[in-house]
Each structure stands twice: as structure tokens, then as C-alpha cells.
């Protein structure tokens, strides 16, 4: 006897609907509060029974999967966008109960679009990589604010001067900015210094991890991929065997070009940007090495740059690097994701 369950998870509550495949009996319940203790109480009724559970890969899924596996449940993590698409275009009521039922029905007829559930050490690595990516983004935003303030007050361009170096900061002090502008620049520099303090130990840990981990070492054999880009690619791409081809890995990363065509009309394509932003960042950073004289991709980059421009040429090299990374990790098999 198998019980098939659909869970719709939110911060305030988890809505559940299940069906006993032997009797056809349907049950419903809500878990409040939607925390670990509340979920354990709810799952107590299913202990000792064969359980298949579907839930979407939304915020909070990790602890739910852990608790479900504790009682021996077979867990299926649904990809949210594909799951919503399988509702069809016909308008239907959108409630938590309807969402739970939709997941349960898709799982029951084997049509659930599943996401990969990474092992715990990859989830932890992914969390650290994404934290670093967030801090780097914030650091860049504060730098952009400094540039905006300088331009707003008509300051000369800082040709060849790094604004965050000692020379650059001395140059900023000598501009004679108005008090409000000086305050903006001072606060921005202070925030950048704070972010640098937070980034330093994270970078150190990730670099050390990349030196020890087999998958990262294999990725770093490719020209342009360093310690931080390798560990980001590994964390975000995960088990490359889950993709049927390198093209599917490109789609997952959001580096594929969308196409809108009707009859003879074809709109210009753009990046789908559907995948993890940190993965696209790592690949784009690595791809910028393609313009170097020693790069094996230099000729390809120059040809693409002549037709498409430098930015799109870098994206083309990024796709090539992703395909190489996919094949490298796939060939390593289980060794690619070994804990460091």
C-alpha cells in the first residue's frame, strides 16, 4: 500500500493532500506552524507506511525533505515553473489546497517535472557560494553609487585610478566635494570595507575547498576557470549526469537564447536567465579570459566579437566553457561531487 502526498509549503502553513492508492481514500490537512516540530507531528500519522511525497523547490524545502526522509518517505522535488505550466492555460481556482492536489495528481500519474535534490554537503557549498555572490553584488552596487555621485557633481574621470586603492581614496579626498556628496562617498567606502572584511574568510574557505575537491581540480584544468569560478560551477551545476546533454545544461544555466517566431516574423533573441545567477556570473567571468593571446578560445572569441560585439562574444565563450565543464564532471561520475 502506497500513500501519495502533495505538499504546498508556505511560511505560515503547509497544506497537504494525500490519497491511499489501495482504497482511493483522500485525506487533507494543514500543518501550523510550518516548522520542523509541526511537520514531525503531522508525519507521525504516516510512520511505518510507504509514502511518496511531492513538493515544490521553493524556500524552505530542505528541512521538509530531511524530515520526510527520516520516516523513509520517497521524496520528489518539483520544478516550480514547469509544474505551474502543466496546469494548462485554462483558468482555474488558485488555492493552497488546489496546489497540493495538483502536485499529488502529477506524482500519481508520473508527470511531475522533478528537480535534483543535492546531497547536504553540496547544499552547504551552494549556500556559501550564493552568500559570496550576494556580497560581491552589494560591493559592486556601492562602487556604482560612488561613480554616480562623482558624475552628478561633474568630477573629472578617474583615468587609470582604482578608487578603492590608497591612491584612489586620496584622489577622492582632493576633489573638494560638497558635504552631502562627501558623506555619500564616505558611507559607500565604509560599506565596501565592511563587505571586504566579510568576503575575505569566505574566499579563503572556498579557495581551500577548490584545491582539495576532485571535481573543482578537474574544472580548473580548463583555461580561464580559477578556484572561485570552479567551486561556483560545481555547487550550482551539481551532478552533471542529471542533464541528458550539454545543451540542457546551457538551458539550466539560463545562457540559452530565447526565440519568438510566428510565420515569417522572428523577434531578436535574448538570454533566458532562468538559472542560478551565480553560475552565469562564474561562467562569464571565466569567459573573459577568452580574449587573451594565450587562450585556446581567442580565435573563436575574435570571430564572434567581430559579428556580435565583445559582450555577446564573452557569452558565446561562456557557453563553450559550460559544455566543457558538463563533460568533465559527467566523466568523473560520483567522484565529481565527493566531499573535500
Question: What annotation goes with each model-predicted range?
Answer:
Residues 1-340:
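A detector of single, family-specific signature residues
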